[in-house]
UniProtKB/Swiss-Prot annotation:
The chain crosses the membrane at residues 17-37, 61-83, 88-105, 130-150, 158-178, 190-210, 230-250, 254-274, 279-299, 328-348. It comes from Borrelia duttonii (strain Ly). Catalyzes the initial step of the lipid cycle reactions in the biosynthesis of the cell wall peptidoglycan: transfers peptidoglycan precursor phospho-MurNAc-pentapeptide from UDP-MurNAc-pentapeptide onto the lipid carrier undecaprenyl phosphate, yielding undecaprenyl-pyrophosphoryl-MurNAc-pentapeptide, known as lipid I. One of its GO terms (molecular function) is UDP-N-acetylmuramoyl-L-alanyl-D-glutamyl-meso-2,6-diaminopimelyl-D-alanyl-D-alanine:undecaprenyl-phosphate transferase activity. It catalyses: UDP-N-acetyl-alpha-D-muramoyl-L-alanyl-gamma-D-glutamyl-meso-2,6-diaminopimeloyl-D-alanyl-D-alanine + di-trans,octa-cis-undecaprenyl phosphate = di-trans,octa-cis-undecaprenyl diphospho-N-acetyl-alpha-D-muramoyl-L-alanyl-D-glutamyl-meso-2,6-diaminopimeloyl-D-alanyl-D-alanine + UMP. This is Phospho-N-acetylmuramoyl-pentapeptide-transferase. Pathway: Cell wall biogenesis; peptidoglycan biosynthesis. Its EC number is 2.7.8.13. It is found in: Cell inner membrane. One of its GO terms (biological process) is regulation of cell shape. It is a multi-pass membrane protein. Belongs to the glycosyltransferase 4 family. MraY subfamily.
Length: 351
């Protein structure tokens, strides 16, 4: 790591974050074409839902999947140079990223092998998510700081709730929900990664404020000692995500796959847990929450009445069926995601 060079600039979180971001972005631009060509040669193409929008079957055939590999490669290489590895919060987030990426990779691989969109057995998939989330939340519970089991509520200065040992199942719920909601949203070129970039950017701000005693006291938010390394991690993830978006923007040359979406969702959920922003995260990731609710509502109502609330779920497909172009859906969802992020950040001061 560059820290051994003793350069004064490397003591500054902002400097390391900026260069971790730039480094990961440039790595994605450099290695992106190579990884895309390798995935094509290996015939690791995206398997499309047969019950999805019909035009997707012709437009998106033959596009390689497992794009999460590109993101995480760039993130890890960048972090090698810019982060202090032996930080407990970074190690927990790293475990979440790798474990959920492996689960998603297995799911993607089985879809390709079987040539259908079923992938990993849903029971095994949820068991894997439960196992990995349990391990990571237990690690956080026992090695985290003094605030670890306390929930802080936006808008209220002194409203707190100490969950005690119940924080473990609560944390597992946050991780699994975040992982699956990001996965459900990954249905259009640039949609999930663009919304993820908005969430990552907001979490960078929250992580920086939370890491500083002075800002934490002024804003009446918990000061989480040691979380400054998460700012650098999120910076690298932001750079890698921007680099991936370069190739995933319409018309996409690569898809994120479950390798990316399951892992990014879980990672951001874990970061929210560490930063004591669990409730805030629900606002921040508002588009992902709405997308998930649209699927739940569609399934529940259809089972009871045999009628559909939406033309198609998740919600982004509903708007496609209404005649919106893919780019219209994506850009409008990005705008709404940005509004949710601004709303979430504004609550930090309104207490």
């Amino acid at each position: 790591m560059f820290c051994f060079l003793g350069l004064r600039l490397l003591k500054y979180i902002t400097f390391r974050t900026a260069y971790a971001t730039i480094f990961a972005f440039l790595l994605a631009l450099i290695f992106g074409p190579f990884i895309i060509s390798r995935l094509k040669k290996l015939k690791l193409d995206q398997i499309l839902r047969k019950d999805g929008p019909k035009r997707h079957l012709s437009e998106k055939m033959g596009i390689p999947t497992m794009g999460g590999v590109l993101i995480f490669f760039c993130v890890l290489v960048s972090l090698f140079f810019w982060i202090h590895f032996f930080n407990i919060y970074f190690l927990i987030v790293l475990f979440v990223m790798v474990s959920f990426a492996c689960l998603g990779f297995t799911d993607d691989l089985l879809k390709i092998k079987r040539k259908n969109s079923d992938g990993l057995n849903p029971k095994f998939k949820i068991y894997g998510q439960i196992l990995f989330s349990f391990i990571s939340v237990v690690m956080l519970y026992y090695f985290g700081g003094e605030h670890v089991s306390i929930l802080y509520f936006p808008f209220f200065k002194s409203l707190k709730l100490d969950l005690g040992i119940l924080y473990i199942p609560f944390g597992m719920f946050v991780l699994i929900s975040a992982s699956n909601s990001f996965n459900l949203t990954d249905g259009l070129d640039g949609l999930a990664i663009g919304l993820s970039i908005v969430v990552i950017g907001a979490l960078i701000i929250i992580a920086y404020l939370t890491s500083r005693v002075d800002f934490a006291l002024y804003l009446n938010i918990p000061n989480v000692k040691g979380c400054e390394e998460l700012v650098i991690f999120l910076g690298a993830l932001l750079g890698g995500s921007f680099g991936f978006l370069w190739f995933n923007a319409y018309p996409a040359k690569i898809m994120m796959g479950d390798t990316g979406s399951l892992s990014i969702g879980a990672v951001l959920g874990m970061v929210a847990l560490i930063l004591k922003s669990e409730i805030l995260f629900a606002i921040l990731a508002g588009v992902f929450v709405v997308e998930t609710l649209s699927v739940i509502i569609q399934v529940v109502v259809y089972k009871k009445t045999k009628k559909r609330v939406f033309k198609m779920a998740p919600l982004h497909h509903h708007f496609e069926e209404l005649g919106w172009s893919e780019m219209q859906v994506v850009i409008r969802f990005w705008i709404i995601g940005l509004i949710f992020a601004i709303l979430a950040l504004s609550t930090i001061k309104i207490r």
